[in-house]
């Protein structure tokens, strides 16, 4: 090959272009300019035919823990969960009511009363550091509060409880950040639980069969949820992109006993 041919022939390879459903023309233009040999999606939707016809490799995002609300709604007991601790509440004379969801978006989480709260919840006297016996407190579903009928006056108390993640935290983050409107909240589901595990394996096989144009699956969120907590006004309250604390349940905890 002479020098002129070497310098004039278009070079391709080792460049992957992210794309989305509403930027197809721009994607094609950048592919040509940069000599990209692969395309990856940003939102997990099907690729437009125009992009499939480019001959480039297709990298498709695949979500194992969401994007099937029909399944999640049919099996609410296998929705992902996390532990939440309330703020500190000071007892006065008489009963103390501790609201569980204060400071937490009701769109994001829902209190789990399906599993035995006496076993999986904990009320702690923070002034002494000692847990309160289950028979000394009760949960009032109507008010959403844990009630201590006879607390120690001027002692501080907290409640730790399980909550379902009824809106995938990352999906909520994307929606809030980008100002999305008129869309369905994606519900999480726990792929480690028996029914969802079997469903997930079949769902993956079906996706592969039905998307033969995809060269590489880009798995995102294998089984855990990032710990992203929003308040009632959808403001970020706690953000941890590295932790796994939003991936717990009585079923999983039982595996460690």
Task: Name the predicted role of every residue range.
Residues 1-257:
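Glycan-processing catalytic domains of CAZymes
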């Amino acid at each position: 090959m002479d020098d002129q041919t070497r310098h004039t022939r278009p070079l391709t390879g080792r460049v992957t272009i992210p794309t989305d459903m509403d930027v197809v023309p721009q994607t094609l233009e950048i592919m040509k300019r940069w000599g990209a040999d692969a395309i990856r999606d940003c939102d997990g939707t099907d690729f437009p035919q125009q992009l499939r016809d480019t001959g480039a490799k297709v990298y498709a995002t695949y979500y194992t823990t969401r994007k099937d609300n029909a399944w999640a709604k049919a099996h609410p007991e296998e929705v992902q969960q996390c532990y939440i601790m309330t703020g500190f509440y000071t007892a006065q004379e008489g009963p103390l009511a501790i609201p569980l969801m204060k400071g937490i978006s009701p769109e994001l989480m829902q209190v789990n009363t399906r599993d035995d709260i006496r076993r999986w919840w904990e009320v702690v006297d923070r002034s002494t550091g000692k847990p309160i016996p289950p028979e000394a407190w009760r949960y009032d579903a109507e008010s959403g509060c844990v009630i201590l009928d006879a607390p120690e006056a001027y002692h501080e108390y907290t409640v730790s409880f399980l909550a379902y993640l009824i809106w995938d935290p990352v999906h909520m983050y994307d929606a809030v950040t980008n100002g999305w409107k008129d869309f369905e909240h994606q519900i999480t589901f726990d792929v480690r639980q028996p029914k969802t595990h079997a469903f997930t394996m079949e769902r993956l096989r079906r996706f592969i069969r039905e998307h033969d144009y995809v060269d590489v699956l880009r798995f995102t969120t294998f089984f855990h949820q990032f710990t992203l907590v929003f308040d009632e006004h959808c403001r970020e309250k706690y953000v941890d992109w590295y932790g796994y604390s939003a991936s717990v349940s009585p079923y999983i905890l039982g595996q460690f006993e």
